[in-house]
Amino acid sequence: MGKVHGSLARAGKVKSQTPKVEKQEKPKKPQGRAYMRLLYTRRFVNVTLTNGKRKMNPSPASQ
């Protein structure tokens, strides 16, 4: 058994401090074949090439 890092009295401190955000109503994702088709179009059809590399997030937050 490993040693406990810090006292167990502080367990769950951060989770209890974070404000509760309600789940949003979203349109349902396609399933099975249709979802694989969506991934294919996202990855290979609408490719965003930057410096000759494929980027998953074309507009990153870093400058």
Swiss-Prot record:
GO terms for cellular component: cytosolic small ribosomal subunit. Residues 1-33 are annotated as: Disordered. GO terms for molecular function: structural constituent of ribosome. It is found in: Cytoplasm. InterPro entries: Ribosomal_eS30. It holds the Pfam family Ribosomal_S30. GO terms for biological process: translation. The keyword Transport does not apply. Its main location: cytoplasm. Keywords: Cytoplasm, Ribonucleoprotein, Ribosomal protein. Component of the small ribosomal subunit. Mature ribosomes consist of a small (40S) and a large (60S) subunit. The 40S subunit contains about 32 different proteins and 1 molecule of RNA (18S). The 60S subunit contains 45 different proteins and 3 molecules of RNA (25S, 5.8S and 5S). Belongs to the eukaryotic ribosomal protein eS30 family. This is Small ribosomal subunit protein eS30.
